[in-house]
Amino acid sequence: MTLHLLRSEGSWADLWSFDLASQGVRLLEIGQHRQFLGASAIERSSRFASTTQAQRFLASRAALWLVLAEYGVGYQELDYGPHGKPSLGISMGFNLSRTGDVAVVAVASADVGVDIEQRRSVDLTEPIVAEVGSTLRRIGWPPRLGHDRLQAWTVMEAWTKYHGLSLHRLLDEREVASRMIDELESRTVQLVSLALSAYICGAMCTGSEAAVGYESGSRLL
């Protein structure tokens, strides 16, 4: 029995981080040995423009299943909701995000969404991005950190993944955008700022009462 199987009470969310530059080869080895890399993942990896990108994708998939195994979840093909959110028909929530050489896996007692992005110059001109940024400043999130549109974008991504919605609906439907703003202002959802390095920003969206824990993927390798 793994340690995480003992967490049966209360609302919680754990975030696991992996450095694909230093751990990617080992993750691929584990993924192949434990048969974590199914036909659908391998097929998707073939669509990437370079071998490096394909290997990072497969390594992040191996990381997902390695983490889920810590919670007693065995490998199986993922099901996908109408807007692309993966599910396994289990009570726990989980989510994966990858940018550059970094991957994070969020596991929670209920729904969870996570997004990380490499800091870079981006042209995010959609009105909802500015509106979310203004809302974040108003509620004082994240504390002690600067606000920018890329950070607001990670919140938008995490929120839509939390709810199993497509980002296009948030961008195109005012009703969905208003719902997000209302949930941020009322603290119906909990936002966790992910400052993994000076070059990466991110956000995790969980239930409002979830106790958040942080884990290094290195201890699973």
List the predicted regions and their residue ranges.
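Conserved nucleotide-ligand handling architecture
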Residues: 1-221
